[in-house]
Amino acid sequence: MLALISILLLFYISQNNLITLLIAIEILLLTVTVKLIYMGSVYDDIYGTIFSIVIIILAGAESAIGLSILVSYYRLRGKVGHTI
C-alpha cells in the first residue's frame, strides 16, 4: 500500500498534464479509502466505512469541480499544462 502511494506521488510530481494530475489525486484518495475499509473490517469498526463513504463523496465533488475548471482553462488558453 505504501509503495502504491509513493509511486502515485512520484507520478503526481513528475507529470506535466493537469488531467493526469487529477487522475493521480483520485487514485490516491481511492487508495486511502480502500485502506480505511480494510482496517474497518479487520477491527470490526463502522467508523472506517462511514469515513470512506464521506471520502468517496468528496472525491466525486472534487472531480466535478476540477474537471469543470480544466474545461474552462482549456477554452481560455487552448492547452492544459502546468510548470513546477
Swiss-Prot record:
Q: Which InterPro entries match?
A: NADH_UbQ_OxRdtase_chain4L/K, NUOK/Mnh_C1-like
Gene3D superfamilies annotated for this entry? 1.10.287.3510
Keyword list, A-Z: Electron transport, Membrane, Mitochondrion, NAD, Respiratory chain, Translocase, Transmembrane, Transmembrane helix, Transport, Ubiquinone
Which GO BP terms apply? ATP synthesis coupled electron transport
Give its E.C. classification number.
7.1.1.2
Q: Any transmembrane segments, and where?
A: 7-29, 50-70
Record GO terms (molecular function): NADH dehydrogenase (ubiquinone) activity
Keyword Repressor part of the UniProt annotation: no
What GO cellular component entries does it have? mitochondrial membrane; NADH dehydrogenase complex
Q: How does it sit in the membrane?
A: Multi-pass membrane protein
**Top EC class per UniProt?**
translocase
Which subcellular locations apply to this protein? Mitochondrion membrane
Which reaction(s) are listed as its catalytic activity? a ubiquinone + NADH + 5 H(+)(in) = a ubiquinol + NAD(+) + 4 H(+)(out)
Disulfide bond annotation, renumbered to this chain:
none
The record's comment on protein family reads: Belongs to the complex I subunit 4L family.
Q: Which PANTHER family does the entry link to? A: NADH-UBIQUINONE OXIDOREDUCTASE CHAIN 4L (PTHR11434:SF16), NADH-UBIQUINONE OXIDOREDUCTASE SUBUNIT ND4L (PTHR11434)
What function does the entry list? Core subunit of the mitochondrial membrane respiratory chain NADH dehydrogenase (Complex I) that is believed to belong to the minimal assembly required for catalysis. Complex I functions in the transfer of electrons from NADH to the respiratory chain. The immediate electron acceptor for the enzyme is believed to be ubiquinone.
Instruction: Give the protein name, as stated in the record.
Output: NADH-ubiquinone oxidoreductase chain 4L
